[in-house]
Amino acid sequence: MKFGAQTEYGRLRKVLMHRPTEENRRITPGNKDAYLFRDVVYWKEFQREHDVFSDLLRDEGIEVVMLTDLLDEDQAGIAETLPNMVYTRDVCMVSRLGAHSLRMTYAARQVEPFLVEKAMEKLGVPIAQRITPPALVEGGDFVWLNEETVMMGFITRSNEAGVNMVRERLMGGGAVKEFVAVPLPSFRVHLDGAVMAMSPDIALFHEASLGLYPAYVYDGEGVRLQYLRDYLEGKGLEIIEGNDTEVRMFGTNIIGLGDYKCVSYEWNERIIGILDDRGFDVLTIPGSQLSIGGGGPHCMTCPILRE
């Protein structure tokens, strides 16, 4: 089968998701931090909001593959006990080389890559890489600038060993020509919460998250230091600033569908307006419960194929 998703804005053809069931009933005020949730959620509304999102993607002609449909009964039963499994982005990244099976930082998510790897094998996507200790890599730290360039955040969830493993595989395998490693401050969980390439010439950007430390830009000539904003502007991108409140509420965590169409949470009104002025068609979904888990539309999708 065809696979590979090396942009954020190419036509999205196939995506892996996980429909939440009653696993979120496990979350209590006492264990919510261990489960990486901001608070308890009402599981039926959480599920309903997710259904709205997945139905929207199907209505746009995107093939939505649900994780549990690819697992055996025992594996599916385990998946339905994992509150964070809904954020499939973090568990796997699919490049033109195949699926990169990642390694999660916290105990609440450690088994997720095993399940997603089984799903990728069932789909016929080759496993291009398995992240192994001491490396840690979470998929929310990948943001593709274009087909030849990927940005990867590290420090908070992914680590330096993970950066090196992924960089060596992608660059060594000829999948990318430039690899930009972006150090994140302690308050920023993943890179996709602070920057998003909306098109070849427009990016959402949060200066408070990304302006503290220079990034490492690797290319065929070696490595150089450059602040990410300067790097993006040097590539000719227009920067649209997200403010602290918007970023807290996943205002930059948008999933592109292709042809200047994308999906955002419905309350992201200012950024939606700016994108609308630039010719984007921004589709919206509710997320009063989904966002409590700590993710947005980008987080809940693991692209398998873009064109």
Q: Can you say where each PLM-predicted feature lies in the sequence?
A:
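The feature marks the mature, well-folded catalytic cores of soluble enzymes
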Residues: 1-307
